[in-house]
């Protein structure tokens, strides 16, 4: 079997295609969430705490020197990334809950006791007397 044929069989399998679609949609969803956080969520929060732009929040660790930029601890960008993560985590958790609820089969009614179980129950009840 040629390598090209093996690869084609591998790539066409359902799991690989599903995973590829998931990765592409996940990347697009991540961009949407990043835009939501940086363009919609963070500006009002920054405005509420005194007109702060979170992108610019940083602490200078070492000043700029000739030929080198200042070393900055950009904690504002980190805060935005935390918001990104939380929104994505909540969305994924919600989707997993819905999918699990759909996949979960309706619980079957308890099975009728077998003849042996009925007999053992009668014996137990007689011994209790």
Curated annotation (Swiss-Prot):
GO terms for molecular function: mechanosensitive monoatomic ion channel activity. The keyword Transmembrane helix applies. This is Large-conductance mechanosensitive channel. GO terms for cellular component: plasma membrane. It is a multi-pass membrane protein. InterPro entries: Mechanosensitive_channel_CS, MS_channel, MSC/AndL, MscL_channel. It comes from Actinobacillus pleuropneumoniae serotype 5b (strain L20). The keyword Phosphoprotein does not apply. Coiled coil: none annotated. Gene3D superfamilies: Large-conductance mechanosensitive channel, MscL, domain 1. It is found in: Cell inner membrane. Homopentamer.
């Amino acid at each position: 079997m040629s390598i090209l044929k093996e690869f084609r069989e591998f790539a066409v399998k359902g799991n690989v295609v599903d995973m590829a679609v998931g990765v592409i949609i996940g990347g697009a969803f991540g961009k949407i969430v990043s835009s939501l956080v940086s363009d919609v969520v963070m500006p009002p929060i920054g405005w509420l705490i005194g007109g702060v732009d979170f992108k610019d929040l940083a602490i200078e660790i070492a000043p700029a020197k000739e030929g080198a930029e200042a070393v900055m601890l950009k904690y504002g960008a980190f805060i935005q990334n935390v918001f990104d993560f939380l929104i994505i985590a909540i969305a994924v958790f919600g989707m997993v809950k819905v999918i699990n609820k759909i996949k979960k089969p309706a619980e079957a009614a308890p099975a009728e006791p077998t003849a042996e179980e009925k007999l053992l129950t009668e014996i137990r009840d007689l011994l209790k007397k």
